[in-house]
Every structure is written in structure tokens, then in C-alpha cells.
Amino acid sequence: TCVATGTRLHLIEPLGFKINEKALKRAGMDYWDDLDVTTYIDYNDFLEKNPGAKIYMATTKAHQVYTDVKYEPDCYIMFGKESAGIPEEILVEHEEDCMRIPMIGEIRSLNLGNSVAIVLYEALRQQNFAGMNLEGHLHELHWK
């Protein structure tokens, strides 16, 4: 999703997955070389290297829905590990910046990749998909 949208991926350790050639191939990430990615040793490292960053936090614990947020062009959208989410110690300091994707019942959470795509495309929609291809083309035939 990041490669398709020209979005930089910021990874904050410890990661919930391994970044090695075998793991990337298994995940079908043959476009890894095209990915704009930055890795940080921890959350404080991220904050130090991105001073003044506007961060929205995706969490099942939030009060507001992701579509209620007005995303700025250079904001960050943080997602936690699929198994645990963003640590509550971080969430409680940013309650007004937390948002959720609505779900029914007592479902724990959506797949991390799906959640990223849902929220990222809402942020891009609010920016009128700036810089993105808005039209597709047939390869062999022509539209009538």
C-alpha cells in the first residue's frame, strides 16, 4: 500500500515481524526495494527525529471514527502491532488524536494491512488523491 501511494513507511522497533529476505518473499513483498522506509529504535527515537509531528493513532480503544479526522498532508498515522496495538502508555497521552475503524460485535481487530489501507486511503481522499493516477486504461480494448 505504501509503494502504491508514494507513502513513506516509518517502522518503530520492536517490530511484530521480521524484515529479512525470506520473510519478505513469503509475504509477497517483492517491491521492498521500491519502498521508502525509515526504522527507529523506539517511540522516543521517532519523536526526536520528527519534532512537531502531527500523529494520529489507530486503535480499537478510541472514541472517534477515522472518517471524523481531518488529515493534514504531512501527518503521521500510527498503527500498533497486530497482536497488541499501540501501547496504552502512549494512547493516554494522545486521546484526542486516537481514532478507530468501526466493527461489529466483539471482534478484537482488523488485519493490520487492511487497517492501514482503509485509513491511508481516507487521508488521501481528503487530499483529493494529490499526485495519484485518477484514471485507468484498458490494455487491449477501448471504452465505448
PLM regions with names:
Residues 1-144:
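Post-transcriptional modification and biogenesis factors for structured RNAs
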